[in-house]
Structure formats: C-alpha cells, structure tokens
Amino acid sequence: MEDQEMHLKVRRVADKFTESMYFLANEPSVALYRLQEHVRRSLPELVQHKTDMQSWEEQSQGAIYTVEYACSAVKSMTNSSIYFKNIDSLLRQTISMKEQISNSQGRSPHVSAPSASS
C-alpha cells in the first residue's frame, strides 16, 4: 500500500512539475522573447529583399521610360513623312528650275561663260 501511495505522490509531483514547465514555456513574456528572436533573425533578409525589389523597380522604370521615349520618337518619325515628302517635292522643283535656267543660259548668245581663272 505504501508503495502505491508513494507512486501516486510521485506521479502528482511529476504532473505538477510538467504543468509548471508547460506554463513557463508558454508564458507571454517567453512568447514575446521568441517573437523578438524570430524578427531579429528574419529582418535582415527581409530588408535585403526589399532593397533588391526597389533596385529592380528603379531599373524597370528606367527601361520603361526608354522604351516609351523610343516609341514616341518612332511615332514622330512616321508622322514626319509628310514633311519629307514636301521637302522631296521642293527639291525636285528646284532641280527642274535649275535645269531650265541652265538650258536657257546655254541658248542665250548674250551670256558669257564664267572664266576658269580664280
């Protein structure tokens, strides 16, 4: 009987000890300490990821600006084709007028040829 009593007392003490350890392990201050440790370990990596993402965002924004600027330049060039056609037409008219002037000077007896001496 005494042996069973002793066994029961030992079991109660062990249960109380286990309960106390469980309570201490899950106490709010311990939980906050564990949370702090987790943040301390995780934060540098998260900061590095954030820095990398910001750098990639800046590079992407620069590339987007460059592409938009290039598209704008190409669009301006396609819109300027009318001006190039106008210049082409004016150059053709000028060449035609010069040929007419050259032909009329070549037929005119009063016009002297330019001298070759400089």
From Swiss-Prot:
Its main location: membrane. Residues 98-118 are annotated as: Disordered. InterPro entries: BORCS8. GO terms for cellular component: BORC complex; lysosomal membrane. Keywords: Lysosome, Membrane. The keyword Membrane applies. Disulfide bonds: none annotated. It is found in: Lysosome membrane. Residues 98-107 have a biased composition (Polar residues). It holds the Pfam family BORCS8. Belongs to the BORCS8 family. As part of a BORC-like complex, it may play a role in the movement and localization of lysosomes at the cell periphery. Associated with the cytosolic face of lysosomes, this complex may couple lysosomes to microtubule plus-end-directed kinesin motors, driving lysosome movement toward the cell periphery. This is BLOC-1-related complex subunit 8. It comes from Tetraodon nigroviridis (Spotted green pufferfish). The gene is borcs8.
